[in-house]
């Protein structure tokens, strides 16, 4: 009766604690729902602004999502049915195997009982020494056989693992050598290309400087010749005036001769003067005509030289364009080599990861081998019925421990997923900080002296305001431009590095999950080394205590001369009772722990259901983001696509660029016009690059939205997994209940059958009372520990929930910042487009 009263009291305490825990859990749930409702209200205020932009894309996306959802649900149902069938088959096979094992163990126990009964009879007949020697020999032989078999198995496994390791190492060395050879080839090709590019640039610069000096020298010569020609033209004009004056005098003299009234004495003077003028004017006129002819010949020669120089300048411009084309082709050939190098580095990293996994697996197998050897050394043959029962109980305890460890590992995996997500976030933040520091360092650097190419050569002392006179190709790549291709390449490399790191982390996490699943399949459960060491130490301490007690009893019997058989039976019954009490305690603790885990799984399941409902409502209320961008067709420039999207179909960007190139090489234009044309071409190329960058940012934002949707799907998958885990833990709890009932029945039968009068003699009333008090104290202690553990788990769950909410807030803030950036980019692009359209209108 006292036992039943204690059991009812313990059940009442358990019910009270469970009720208290459920009430606390419901309060926490209510608080959590209030907090989440407030959060939803705040989010709804923010989502009102976002709803106006994304109504057009929502219908198409919902239609596609419905199709995909139908397909996914069908696939999920098929997979679930297949998994359930496989699980049912595995369960049936395990049940059959378990029943066969039980039958085999029962047969072994019966045989051992018969053999031990025969040995007891022989001992009673008076041949203890012979039996002991026979038992020792049999035990040694069996131990040797078992050890040899285990040794052979372990040696075979070690040899197989060594062979596999050698093969993997050889393959890895081959791959590493191939990677090194390919990397060396790529480096050599890269260096050759770089040297050729630098050489071509230097030659172009020298040729351009030489041509500019020649043009400047010829321009000066033309200026000097023009000045001389002007002087000579003035002299010829003076001579022409003198000639006209002499002609007038001659005409006057002739008129005077015709009129008779004129004096005669003036005639000789006039005629003499006319003759003198004729004689003096004819050689000067001849000299002027010779000089004019000579100057005309010089002018013709100079014009021919200028034409030759113009032709040579055109040829050099064509050569320059060809060299630029070759340089672009070399860059396009260099890009696939870089991509190939990246792929090879990725393969190398994957192989290193596989090698690490294989090494860790080898270490685990060697550790397991050592543990199996230690177990084989510890295992000994049971010498009596009590030892055999004890070994069976230990097996059952180990099986239950393995189940407990499996469930604990499931919880650890869920926590590891959260930790990996936090780690990925920290890596991304660190990459952002590094990029920001690089940009600050670049901005902090002093601007380099700009080399400006003028009409008369290169001017290194020109101010920054003389950008209008720069026509060289190199000035487009100075630090005065807002964003250079080197900066674009560095930013692209940084983005690729972050994406590579994220992919590597996800691959490592998936590989760890696969390795963990394989280990569970091979071992049949996880092994905790610390627990095994503790249990081993406890068993060794119990064995030592039992041995000392047996020695003390033997000494007491030798001294007192009492009956050995009665004392052995009494001791065996006492041990049996104590073991059964310990088993009941352990099973009660396991039952409480399993109940607590089931409750935790239910809470987590409810939280995930609430989260899924919240995400569905949010998706229903606030549709997805619509960026309203036109996709770029391959082969078309982004500026052309944008012009077509805006309705401007008259302008062809490629033809416009060709015309600008032709106008830039045209010698009929002035220097300022050539500079304006080249600057317009560079601005157009920069606008195309800017458009490409905007397209890349928009695609990255769309990828992030897809990632958020995949996280939502992951939440739903985790809910399904937790449902399955909850069912599994319920089944384990039911099995534990059944096992506890079986143990209680075994204890009751043992007390009924074996105890009798001897138990009454063994345990007095005081000892029974002490035992009841100890059991009640132990139950109170277990209940207090359970309460503390429940409170700790609740605290941990609340912390995890807060972390998840913080992550959701951070993601929403990131989305808002990205939306702002997109708006700013769109505004900047519209401003640029208007600016260029006005510039083209004014220029035309």
UniProtKB/Swiss-Prot annotation:
Domain of life: Eukaryota
Subcellular location: Golgi apparatus
Region (Disordered): 249-290, 466-488
Polar residues bias: start-end ranges: 466-483
Signal peptide: none
Modified residues (Phosphoserine): 384
MF GO annotations: kinase binding; microtubule binding
InterPro entries: JAKMIP, JAKMIP_C
One annotated Gene Ontology cellular component of this protein: Golgi apparatus
Coiled-coil residue windows: 8-259, 289-421, 493-621, 688-833
Positions with biased composition (Low complexity): 270-282
PANTHER family: GOLGIN SUBFAMILY A MEMBER 4-LIKE ISOFORM X1, JANUS KINASE AND MICROTUBULE-INTERACTING PROTEIN 3
Family: Belongs to the JAKMIP family.
The protein, known as: Janus kinase and microtubule-interacting protein 3
UniProt source species: Mus musculus
């Amino acid at each position: 009766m006292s036992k039943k009263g204690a059991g009812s009291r313990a059940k009442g305490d358990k019910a009270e604690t469970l009720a208290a825990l459920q009430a606390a859990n419901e309060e926490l749930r209510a608080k959590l729902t209030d907090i989440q409702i407030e959060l939803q209200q705040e989010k709804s205020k923010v989502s009102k602004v976002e709803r106006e932009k994304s109504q057009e894309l929502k219908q198409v996306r919902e239609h596609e999502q419905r199709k995909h959802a139908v397909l996914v649900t069908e696939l999920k149902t098929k997979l679930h049915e297949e998994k359930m069938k496989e699980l049912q088959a595995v369960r049936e096979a395990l049940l059959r195997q378990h029943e066969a094992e039980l039958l085999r163990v029962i047969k072994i126990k019966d045989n051992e009982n018969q053999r031990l009964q025969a040995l007891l009879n022989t001992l009673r007949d008076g041949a203890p020494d012979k039996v002991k020697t026979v038992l020792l020999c049999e035990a040694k032989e069996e131990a040797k056989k078992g050890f040899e078999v285990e040794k052979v198995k372990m040696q075979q496994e070690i040899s197989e693992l060594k062979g596999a390791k050698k093969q993997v190492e050889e393959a890895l060395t081959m791959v590493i050598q191939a990677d090194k050879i390919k990397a060396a080839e790529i480096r050599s090709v890269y260096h050759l290309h770089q040297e050729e590019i630098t050489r071509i640039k230097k030659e172009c610069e020298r040729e351009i400087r030489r041509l500019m000096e020649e043009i400047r020298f010829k321009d000066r010569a033309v200026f000097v010749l023009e000045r001389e020609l002007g002087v000579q033209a003035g002299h010829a004009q003076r001579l022409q005036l003198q000639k006209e004056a002499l002609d007038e005098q001659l005409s006057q003299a002739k008129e005077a001769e015709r009129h008779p009234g004129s004096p005669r004495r003036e005639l000789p003077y006039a005629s003499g003067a006319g003759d003198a003028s004729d004689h003096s004017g004819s050689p000067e006129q001849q000299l002027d005509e010779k000089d004019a002819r000579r100057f005309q010949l010089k002018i013709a020669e100079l014009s021919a030289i200028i034409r030759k120089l113009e032709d040579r300048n055109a040829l050099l411009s064509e050569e320059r364009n060809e060299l630029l084309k070759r340089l672009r082709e070399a860059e396009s050939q260099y890009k696939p080599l870089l991509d190939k190098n990246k792929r090879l580095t990725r393969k190398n990293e994957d192989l290193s990861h596989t090698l690490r996994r294989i090494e860790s697996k080898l270490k685990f197998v060697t550790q397991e081998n050592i543990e199996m050897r230690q177990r084989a050394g510890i295992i000994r043959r049971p010498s009596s019925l009590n030892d055999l029962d004890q070994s069976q109980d230990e097996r059952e305890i180990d099986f239950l421990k393995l189940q407990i460890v499996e469930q604990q590992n499931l919880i650890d995996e869920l926590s590891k997923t959260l930790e990996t997500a936090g780690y990925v976030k920290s890596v991304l933040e660190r990459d952002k900080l590094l990029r920001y520091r690089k940009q600050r360092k670049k901005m902090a650097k002093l601007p380099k002296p700009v080399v400006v190419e003028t009409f008369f050569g290169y001017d290194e002392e020109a101010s920054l305001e003389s950008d209008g006179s720069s026509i060289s190709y190199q000035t487009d790549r100075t630090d005065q431009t807002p964003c250079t291709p080197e900066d674009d390449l560095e930013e692209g490399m940084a983005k690729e590095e972050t994406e590579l790191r994220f992919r590597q982390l996800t691959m490592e996490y998936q590989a760890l999950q696969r390795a963990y699943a394989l280990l569970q399949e091979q071992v049949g459960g996880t092994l905790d080394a610390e627990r095994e060491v503790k249990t081993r130490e406890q068993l060794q301490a119990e064995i030592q205590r039992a041995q000392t007690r047996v020695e003390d009893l033997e000494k007491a019997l030798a001294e007192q001369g009492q009956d050995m058989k009665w004392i052995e039976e009494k001791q065996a019954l006492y041990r049996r009772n104590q073991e059964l009490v310990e088993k009941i305690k352990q099973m009660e603790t396991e039952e409480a722990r399993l109940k607590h885990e089931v409750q935790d799984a239910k809470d987590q399941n409810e939280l995930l259901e609430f989260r899924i409902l919240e995400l569905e409502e949010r998706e229903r209320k606030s549709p997805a983001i619509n960026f309203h961008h036109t996709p770029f067709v391959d082969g078309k420039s982004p500026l052309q696509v944008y012009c077509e999207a805006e309705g401007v179909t008259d302008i062809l960007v490629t033809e416009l660029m060709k015309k600008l190139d032709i106008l830039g090489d045209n010698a009929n234009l002035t220097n300022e016009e050539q500079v304006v044309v080249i600057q317009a071409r560079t601005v157009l190329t920069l606008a195309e690059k800017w458009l490409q960058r905007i397209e890349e940012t928009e695609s990255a934002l769309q990828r992030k939205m897809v990632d958020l949707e995949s996280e939502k799907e992951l939440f739903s998958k985790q809910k399904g997994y937790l449902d399955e885990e909850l069912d599994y833990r319920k089944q384990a709890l039911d099995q534990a209940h059944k096992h506890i009932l079986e143990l209680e029945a075994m204890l009751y039968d043992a007390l009924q059958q074996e105890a009798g009068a001897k138990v009454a003699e063994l345990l007095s009333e005081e000892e029974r009372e002490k035992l009841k008090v100890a059991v009640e104290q132990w139950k109170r202690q277990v209940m207090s520990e359970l309460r503390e553990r429940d409170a700790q788990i609740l605290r941990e769950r609340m912390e995890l929930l807060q972390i998840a909410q913080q992550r959701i807030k951070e993601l929403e803030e990131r989305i808002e910042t990205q939306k702002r950036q997109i708006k700013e980019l769109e505004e900047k692009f519209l401003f640029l487009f208007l600016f260029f359209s006005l510039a083209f209108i004014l220029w035309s």
